[in-house]
Amino acid sequence: MKWLYNPIVLLAYLFVLSGAAYTPEVRLSTHDVLPSAMQYFDDSPTILSLKNDRLWISQDDGKLFEEVGATKDQHVVSFQIDPFLKDRAFVMTNTKTHFYTENQGKSWKKFDAPIYELKENGMASVPSIEFNAADSNLLIISNYQCPDSGKYSHRCEHKYHYTTDGFRSVSKELPIKAHVCRFARSNPKSQIAKVSSIYCAVNELNSYKHIVQSTLIRSDNFGKDQNVVDLNESGSGAIIDIKVEESFLTVVQKLDKFSENSKIDMYVSRDGESFFKADLQVDIKYGVMSFLDSSPSSFFVQTTDYSSKMSDVAKLFRSDSSGVHYKLLLDNIAEGIVMKVENIDGAWLANTAVDKESDSDDLNSFLDFLLGGGFAKDIVTKFSFDDGDTWQLLKLNNEKCKLADGCSVHLWSFSEYSGKGKFVTGPTPGILMGIGSEGKHLGKYEEMNTYVSRDGGASWDLAIDTPCVFSFGDQGNIIMAVPYHGVKQESPANYFYFSLDQGLSWEKVELEKGIFVLDILTTLDGTSRKFLIEGVKPEEGKQGYTRAKEVQYFVDFANVHDGKVCSDSDFEEWTARKIDEDSSPTCVYGHREKFRRRKADAKCSVDRLFEDIKVIDDPCECTEADFECSIGFMPSEKGDGQKCVPDPTAIKALCGSSKSSVLEIYDKTLVQEDKCNMGGRKVDDFATMEKFKCSEYNKPGDDNSGEVSKIVVKLNEIEGRLSQYAYVGTDDDKLADNVVLKTSEDRAYISNDGGISFVKVPVHDRILGFFTGPVSGQVVLLTDSEYMYVSQDGGALFERRKIPAELSSQISRPIAFHKTDADKFIWIGSDCSKGNCEPVAYYTTNGGQSFKELMTGAITCDYVGSVFEQPEENLVYCTKVEDNNLRSLWSINGQKNPEKLFDNIVGYAVTGHYVVVAVVQDKSLEAKVTVDGKTFADADFPNDLKVEAHQAYTVLDSTSGSIFMHVTTSSKRDFEYGTLLKSNSNGTYFVTSLPNVNRNDVGFVDFDKIEGLEGLIIANIVANYKEDKAPKKLQTQVSRNDGSEWGYFIPPPTDSKGVKYKCNGSPLSKCALHLHGFTERADYRDTYSSGSATGFLIGVGNVGEYLTDYNEAATFLSIDGGVTWKEVQEGVYHWEFGDQGTILALVSANDDTDSIIYSLDEGKTWSEYKFSDKKVKVLDLATVPTDTSRKFLIFAVDPKDSRETLSFSIDFTNIYARQCQLDLDHPDLDDYEYWSPIHPEGQDKCLFGHEAKYLRRLSNKNDCFIGSAPLSEAYKQIRVCPCTRRDYECDYNYVRDPLDNTCKLVPGMSAGDRKKSMCEKPDAFQYFDSTGYRKIPLSTCVGGKQFDKWEPKACPGKQKEFNEYYGRDVKGGKLFILLFVPIVVFVFATWFVYDRGIKRNGGFQRLGQIRLDEEDFSDGFHPIEDNKIDVVVNRIVKGGVVVAAGVVATLKTVRKIDSLLLNKIEMLCLGETRERNYVNIPER
């Protein structure tokens, strides 16, 4: 339910809770409950009010209210007054029974509509009625119910019922499963279709609740007949809304039906049959597009950017009379405040946002944030008299504030709350009121006053020196104004003002009780002399204001001017749209407007109750401004926009609906409903007739068919050289396409549209750099001052925060973010107050508004608790420098005292669910690992790898359930390399995965875990490690089973020109594909792969024995996970993936260029697009981190002048005509296929014990985009595979022998050494006899080859602990259970069998007579069997006899076997020796 009052005024009241002239008749009434809705009937004194689920009515303008008797026993949730039938209103309840009146509430009738009841399970919406302006009997009532989450989406189910007799009879359910339905005649000016026609959007969902198809349906008989309406070039998006505004029917469609934040397309029609796609060139996201008061000849659309939590900005667009072509009228509209002036065509008021002139440190009050003073930018108010084409500042009629001096009036609000339930400027002939201040921009709340204008908003006078809520009566000749507060801001107002001379003078009236005013109501047309002041009166308790009561003041000006009614001489003719007395009125829509209004000083009342203001039209002479482009043409992008050029898409559509083969169209036409006077001129004086042959516009693939490339490029020139950039999100549900960048000029820039445009961050301090956090939207700018600037909305708004300690050169990372809470972060700086500049760590829990000291001496800190499987949200680890200059690790958990964990550490790393600490002990480097933040275990390295204190190690990855770590074994300058280690699942035992892995001098390693594919790793090794001298000779190695086995990439047979490589035919060790790795990348974010483009890899390298120089490389592509490759371009290129791999983009990295190379068909073909009119030096090619966008950014510099950064936005959004069809219920009928990764040496598709299938776009469906289609939901494992060698890796202290692929003990170690090393650990009580193999944690294989069988054994002297751990110790109660209970059961069972099966069948003597060589007891033994129990017992007896005979026979036979034969069998089965240090498994 929307709150009907001015929200700012209400919040002002809430803020306080936290803290002998003519006199009209005033009447006070109080109530316990505030209304949630209040509204007038049109041309009536009757008001409906909803309070606490009860309906109230007043027949006398609010003087008295009484509860509606018909609904007393009902739970009323809302009401709607018919906008077209003045006497009718509908009241909705939470049941299926509702009410309506046809006489303004004098009587009420029931009607039933079996839509969703609000009492049912799930979230049901408040019912809503769709009215028909052409036939009041045709109505639709509907609501919707959403799944348990309650969040509105396409998954919500709508239910529609209709009536053809105004609900006098039972309504009928609409037989259309629609998402939205609208009457074609839901606007009085609409002549679309038939009176009974409805348009509905129907979404077809599959079992996954995905939209498979979205269709526009028209029905002229409420669904009995349904006709599909074709939206021209609509692709396959999802219709989200249908609007009928003025004479336009618009259909709003998401381009990406799987994204709630998709770009929006709008289709417009005036006849309901032919739809044209609007050219609204802006990324519009659902929920941020609104339709403003439109004229008969144009649409006004506002798009609002909600990326900032505190500073929403909007754009205002105006369409031509076709509703297709749009012009941007105003940008950067602050808080979306733009409003058309009532009754005056072409007059608008708007607030614009401009950068602040300074970083003022003055504190804003709470009311400042509510009233605009807390806005992130300065607010400047402007007006337009020419329908938005030009905008000007508001003049103050005071010599102290002149426009020439940059002084003008700026209004925070210029609207009143109408009795219709919406905010308007007021139904007056040019008389306006506003709340604001004067100066260069809107001031603080304490500077705000109330102003009045008598010329439609061009000039203003100071009316009251305090902000007021206002309302107009008697056509603007009575103005009511109630201050927001009393003398003090925290006190209620106990008086109000009124003016009887259009705001020139004011009288003050005292009130019986002070109130915080909410709004002032009067009749819809503003002709009444009665007002209702609605407010609240706080009640004081022991702790201040505790609750509030509703206070109403009924104010009646019935006897004003002694009852005198104005005569003709009391009126004047006023002309609208005149900026001043000397200027001519502006012509809009071909006419000037005049009004007869009362003279300001006349002492009389107009007293024309319910009579709307009349406009006197004065036609203007026709000019070019009265003409616009005809359908089939569009405004030229060159010049002033007056020239019209052919629109191929529109011409194609016109040809499709025309029977003629030739179209003859004027390039311009008179604006619809334009009233200009042609005089002696003709249309040909303004327009030119053009002819088009339809045959030329219907050729498939022809440029004129609308299939031309729709790549859009936007250049931004940014001062300074690019030094840092990053993509950031705005919230968790939105695409992270905000871009923040810093330049060498120490300035920061922000883009909130994916790089299409950039704005400088209005910070005057030098910006040293920025950090982005793990929570979407976190950005912190560091400066050279005592302030930092914090944003939580992707840089849309930065708030200044004072740093608790200054930046220090010894602190490499001054900020540490919390993983999940954006308000928590740690600041580390130097406290120089005592002269020693000691490092100190502080923490904040409120986004930097305040800080508390965390630890003195800390140089690094991290929130680590959230990474563990059982999170400790406030757990922090800090590295502290001790007095001896050694480093120690400390743990701090919330308010607890710091606890030292380790002395003499090198550092720590947080990866996955692990924290790894490097500790120096006994001159060697040891690793400690924790998975819970409390208990640390030793990380045991292979026995042949001794890590000295000076050796470095790098923690690389842990996404596959194991830690990958690189330990440096050669730190010689320019010849650094080391051993790649991999841990078991808890990070305690490490084995050698790959030796001699390349690293650089700062510790970065040539190691890449490929996103999107399990266990695929690429690393570069130093092949000439034995030479121990530079230069390195690198080779690329790939593992497809998570580091267990390594091999070479198979090279492509030919290069990009079709020429065979020289080494073709040589073994892979001499001829393989080698790629430049992590250590050589200019930007470490440029990875081989993308998590969304499954199986796609791009890299720069060469084919040969070794990796050659970077500048001599070529660019290679694989689309099958690296199994096969092809060279796509000769030379070094930057690369990016777009739209989950449907767009592959390359741009030259070494050579100056003006073109981008792209492929839309998985690299089969490549196209070149020129993005610049001159060649530039490209710095980087970028897109969103998820690679799901269809926008790219090229950062470049002019080769001749690198002092500024050139940013090119390359937008492929419109290059695809449709979105790929995804239907997981019918996968054979959509645009996708399943793809499985394979091993080059495997005969099946089993990897890690299962066959996985990933969904990818069909290779031949290159005409569609993927967007946000949830392809991950389609991932499946179709079968579990038997275990093979590839499912195992070497166990601890074992290493793979590449010659025979077996795991052998590390050199110099025996099985006994392994036992010794494991048992020597503190508190160790067991060791394991290993086969040398362990199962890879990622593998899910079952059965097959089992290579990892091992058995735990007790360490010497630890048998007791071993038994206790495995529950093998026998004592006490366990001994009783193990011995006594089985004995009792056995004795009882034996007695029972003897009694029922042996004793009564003759005893043991009888059994002894049975021959054991017969298959049955046919010798006459017939046991007694009276029931089933006897049968079971006798079978046990028989079976016992047979088993006994078998045992005896076996023992006799064993005696005959020669003992030598047993020895031979044992040797054959077990081998000649039982001592082994490897297991030979030839099977791969």
Curated annotation (Swiss-Prot):
Residues 1396-1484 are cytoplasmic. GO terms for cellular component: cytosol; Golgi apparatus; membrane. It is a single-pass type I membrane protein. Glycans are attached at N232, N986. This is Vacuolar protein sorting/targeting protein 10. InterPro entries: Sortilin_C (IPR031777), Sortilin_N (IPR031778), VPS10 (IPR006581), VPS10-sortilin (IPR050310), WD40/YVTN_repeat-like_dom_sf (IPR015943). Residues 21-1374 are lumenal. GO terms for biological process: Golgi to endosome transport; Golgi to vacuole transport; protein targeting to vacuole. Functions as a sorting receptor in the Golgi compartment required for the intracellular sorting and delivery of soluble vacuolar proteins, like carboxypeptidase Y (CPY) and proteinase A. Executes multiple rounds of sorting by cycling between the late Golgi and a prevacuolar endosome-like compartment. The keyword Metal-binding does not apply. Belongs to the VPS10-related sortilin family. Its main location: Golgi. It comes from the Eukaryota. The chain crosses the membrane at residues 1375-1395. It holds the Pfam family Sortilin_C. The gene is VPS10. It is found in: Golgi apparatus, trans-Golgi network membrane; Prevacuolar compartment membrane. Residues 1-20 form the signal peptide.
